[in-house]
From Swiss-Prot:
Keyword Transmembrane: no
Protein name as annotated: Orotidine 5'-phosphate decarboxylase
Catalytic residues, chain numbering: 73 (proton donor)
InterPro entries: Aldolase_TIM (IPR013785), OMPdecase (IPR014732), OMPdecase_AS (IPR018089), OMPdecase_bac (IPR047596), OMPdeCOase_dom (IPR001754), RibuloseP-bd_barrel (IPR011060)
Self-association state and partner proteins as the record states: Homodimer.
Keywords, in A-Z order: Decarboxylase, Lyase, Pyrimidine biosynthesis
General function of this protein: Catalyzes the decarboxylation of orotidine 5'-monophosphate (OMP) to uridine 5'-monophosphate (UMP).
Residues bound to substrate: 22, 44, 71-80, 130, 191, 201, 221-222
Gene3D superfamilies per the UniProt record, alphabetical: Aldolase class I (3.20.20.70)
Enzyme class: lyase
Pathway this chain belongs to: Pyrimidine metabolism; UMP biosynthesis via de novo pathway; UMP from orotate: step 2/2
Enzyme Commission designation: 4.1.1.23
């Protein structure tokens, strides 16, 4: 267990922050995580880091007390995705995602695969990647606005047994209205200051804006990992979250 445990969380409190560990190797990852407090954030491992390090690093981080979001965006035949979700559950993963565009049978198979676990991972559907705009959707044959496609896929994910979806903060408010208060909304594209942003997240908001819109969890990568004082950033976002909840 990471020794840097704070008294931030009570049974009624939950940090909304998920830190994206966008590193390429185990050394840099562990060097960064060493100074984090698992009560101030969850952590996310994506394709690059998982491909480079495998499950050993993931299990090590879980054993240090972190809730781990395994962000591999499964998209395959139902049996393959179901088996992958079972492996994630066996590892003790907190959250795992899959493309909702994989369809109902794939998502239902995933939900059924983990249903028997006492503590099962949250199953999250990926709707429309936050880097995509309407012109990108048109190029792949979807003549619809991103917001409409997000709602369509989110409804499908919910009715297929998933716990929530990934969506931009702009879609959070309409999804809350459509899908209720218990559906988990995981929001990337969170920046401390959206002015002058020029990275690959197109539909972005600040933490306060995203929480007010209805997001459950906020995915933050570079604003935390490249900060001079990452813990100070996490404490500030959690302070904003507490104010938003009150």
């Amino acid at each position: 267990m990471n020794p840097l445990i704070s008294d931030f969380q009570t049974p009624q409190q939950r940090t909304p922050v998920i830190v994206a560990l966008d590193f390429s190797n185990e050394k840099d990852t562990l060097g960064f995580v060493r100074n984090l407090d698992p009560t101030l954030c969850q952590i996310k491992i994506g394709k690059e880091l998982f491909t480079a390090t495998g499950r050993n690093l993931a299990e090590s981080l879980i054993n240090q007390g972190f809730k781990l979001f395994l962000d591999l965006k499964y998209h395959d035949i139902p049996h393959t995705v179901a088996q992958a979700c079972k492996v994630a559950a066996d590892m003790g993963v907190w959250m795992v995602d899959m493309h909702a565009s994989g369809g109902r049978r794939m998502m239902e198979a995933a939900a059924e695969a983990v249903a028997g676990y006492g503590t099962k991972p949250l199953l999250i559907g990926v709707t429309v990647l936050t880097s995509m705009e309407q012109s990108d959707l048109a190029e792949i044959g979807l003549n619809t606005a991103p917001e409409e496609q997000v709602i369509r896929l989110a409804k499908l994910a919910q009715s297929s047994g998933l716990d929530g979806v990934v969506c931009s903060a702009q879609e959070a408010a309409p999804l809350r209205r459509e899908l209720g208060q218990d559906f988990v909304l995981v929001t990337p594209g969170i920046r401390l200051d959206v002015a002058g942003n020029n990275d690959d997240q197109r539909r972005i908001m600040t933490p306060a804006e995203a929480l007010a819109a209805g997001s459950t969890y906020l995915v933050m990568g570079r604003p935390v990992t490249q900060a001079a004082d990452p813990v100070a950033v996490l404490r500030e976002v959690n302070r904003v979250a507490n104010l938003e909840a009150n």
